Amino acid sequence: RKAEEMIAAGEVRVNGSVAKIGDKVDPKKDKVTVKGKPVESHVQEVYIMLHKPRGFITTMSDEMDRKCVAELVQEIPERVYPVGRLDRDSEGLLLMTNDGAFANAMMHPSKHVPKTYRVTVRPSITEDQLTQMAVGIEIEGRKTAPADVRVLSQEPGRVVLEMVLYEGRNREIRKMCEALGLEVARLKRIAIGPVRLGML
């Protein structure tokens, strides 16, 4: 309340310009002054490795009242946000942070940070299908980037694959499998770059 009064009185400046109520401020980049005196920022950077269960959407709020990952981190006092996405039916490693530079470095396509998944498909997979996944598949008019794919285990009716992707298009693994006539029974992200799910 007091802060709003000071802003309304024109006593608060952001990077030299008079602040308005509702202005967004990045404490790491913006210089905030009150009555000409700099305000020191003490933002604690927080990094969370979360094992997202199936059934949760990767968002901090949902107007349709579906379960979202915000519920899993509500005990954390800092406001954190997901780094990238995992769809509702997928599970596994999700990073959350309040460090925008870190989030951008991890997710920006130019960085090519590898993301590793364990994927259970049905009914079986051929060498030709594995090769197509490895070299890239045409999906919605665009070819997927090459992926590293290997078979971890195989039994009648199901195959477990390890897939490493270097780009992160929306639902890419599911779309690749669908294009090859494979059903995804389970999809779990186990690593983002050097950060592994481990025992979570």
Regions found by a protein language model. Name each.
Residues 1-200:
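Basic, flexible Lys/Arg- and Gly-enriched helix-loop patches that mediate nucleic-acid binding at interfaces
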